[in-house]
Amino acid sequence: MSDDNLISRPLTAGAHVSLRSMQEVAMNDRNASKMLSTYNVAYWGGNYYDVNELGHISVCPDPDIREARVDLAQLVKKMQLEQGQRLPALFCFPQILQHRLRSINAAFKRARESFGYEGGYFLVYPIKVNQHRRVIESLVNSGEPLGLEAGSKAEMMAVLAHAGMTRSVIVCNGYKDREYIRLALIGEKLGHKVYLVIEKMSEIKMVLEEAERLNVVPRLGVRARLASQGSGKWQASGGEKSKFGLSATQVLQLVDMLREANSLESLQLLHFHLGSQLSNIRDISTGVRESARFYVELHKLGVNIQCFDVGGGLGVDYEGTRSQSDCSVNYGLNEYANNVIWGIGDACNEHGLPHPTVITESGRAVTAHHTVLVSNVIGVERNEFCEPQPPEAGAPRALESLWDTWQEMQEPENRRSLREWLHDSQMDLHDVHTQYAHGMLDLTHRAWAEQLYLSICNEIQKQLDPSNRAHRPIIDELQERMADKLYVNFSLFQSMPDAWGIDQLFPVLPLEGLDKPPERRAVLLDITCDSDGTIDHYIDGDGVATTMPMPPYDPENPPLLGFFMVGAYQEILGNMHNLFGDTAAVDVYVFPDGTVEVEQTDEGDTVADMLEYVQLNPEKLLEHFRGQVKETDLDTELQAQFLEEFEAGLYGYTYLEDE
């Protein structure tokens, strides 16, 4: 780690507390507690994220060492000031990865001890969740038992290269050709326990042929296609219509083929997969019970299954609602481990069978928490209100009607409902827009009507009561209509593709200002030229809203924003819409003495990098631009300036940069 990429300093989040009155501290503590509730940090944060007494987000990468924490807002600003850190950037906490791994292993250890389970347990990390070197190496160097899973040839090569650090279990999923199969068998020859999971019947013939050529006894697994299926956004990866796995008939055929080839002893692993991000613990229990029946029946057929791979599905609570919604879970690590271990052990005990080694492929649960995308707001559009002025004499009827509604609202004795005022003003505004489109009103008329309508909405909003059920739909409608628009320096398609593709919710909140109660609502928009580049769902207390609660902020100097729990899938699924590339990335290590070490692991893609992806040679582009400039009658100094700017842009960041 070079000195240029290192920050080592104490960060004491409460350094200024002694300068404030105890009353102010108590008030800010109450506000911080309210903001914790508003954004549900206590539940999705997993004890890794918190709001400190300054109202800033703090990060504790290892909750077992509470004194090791860092103020994220202070860290980012220090790096911007001292190192010129560009935003957006991923702030990655490898210590969170290692703590997640330890926590899952510990949960299964407790479950095995609690239920007298005699088999072992292995967490196998499916690298498809996040293949970055920093992630894989942080996990394999953690000192914890860990296996690796590959789903393609490229992933298999990465896994084989890193497996030397663990000498552990390798699970090979996905569709396979002979090259993939040979790589797996070579891994077995090198001393690893490599399980080739049969996903389709045509693979078994190739496996046996290549094993004979390499003179190695293969370890085989079979993926059974269950009738059980989880619910949610990823339910299609499980169930009878799943893309992967063998039906009951095909499982029997596989056993017969292996028996005829005198290779039945090679079939050692049973695998199933209910789906990713399983929200309901009942779905997990049901799937484990059904798969345990496969284990029992295979033993009856003489198959000595030694490993029981329950696949992925261990979810994380993106919302913090602790519910069965698609982006939440109604269980924790301990309950998950208990259900898996008890379900398998109960079936084994009932039929007098040995307890197999349990494998889980819990990639999302390991990686999601460890990465935060931090970015800056580049523009704010917010509604400003001034005292409405009456329309000019002889104004069109639609304008007069809007003004009448406003005046009625100022009369204390008026008993018309808030809903009625809203509907009347909406109809009047619709009339204004229609008449404007037909040339009956001018632009000044339209602007006056729209501003008065906003004032009416603002007045109605002040009088609404969230505890009144009848008011809630109106509250939601007006919050969307009146929300500030924050234009954020990032690409939704590159950094949070699941938010765009499947409406997944990620926790988003300011990194500072959280010692003040929320006063405004906002929606976040990215900088792509695409109307889909907006975040549509936000955490709001124990629910989800279409706007984000915001503490008071200066629109000329808005706070930094953090997009949390983006460590699983988002980096690798991100696409290049508008040629926005990978963001910069840093690894952050936090120590009990208050020091923080930061290593720049990725500078982020340049414009030239992205152009080359689409076969646009940067040097040729520069040459073409130079030719255009030389053909002009601009003076030599100006030509040189334009060429310098173009070349600097080619090798600059794809995102917006301050001068």
Curated annotation (Swiss-Prot):
Residues that, per the record, bind substrate: F308, D309, V310, G311, G312, G313, L314, G315, V316, D317, Y318
N6-(pyridoxal phosphate)lysine: residues bearing it: K128
EC number: 4.1.1.19
A GO molecular-function descriptor: metal ion binding
Stored InterPro entries: Ala_racemase/Decarboxylase_C, Arg_decarb_HB, Arg_decarbox_C, Arg_decrbxlase, De-COase2_CS, De-COase2_N, De-COase2_pyr-phos_BS, Orn/DAP/Arg_de-COase
Pathway connected to this protein: Amine and polyamine biosynthesis; agmatine biosynthesis; agmatine from L-arginine: step 1/1
Swiss-Prot/TrEMBL catalytic activity: L-arginine + H(+) = agmatine + CO2
Domain of life: Bacteria
PROSITE patterns, sorted: ODR_DC_2_1, ODR_DC_2_2
Gene3D superfamilies named among the record's database cross-references: 1.10.287.3440, 1.20.58.930, Alanine racemase, Lyase, Ornithine Decarboxylase, Chain A, domain 1
Single GO biological process annotation from the record: arginine catabolic process
Function: Catalyzes the biosynthesis of agmatine from arginine.
HAMAP family reported for this sequence: SpeA
Protein name: Biosynthetic arginine decarboxylase
Organism: Yersinia pestis
Record gene name: speA
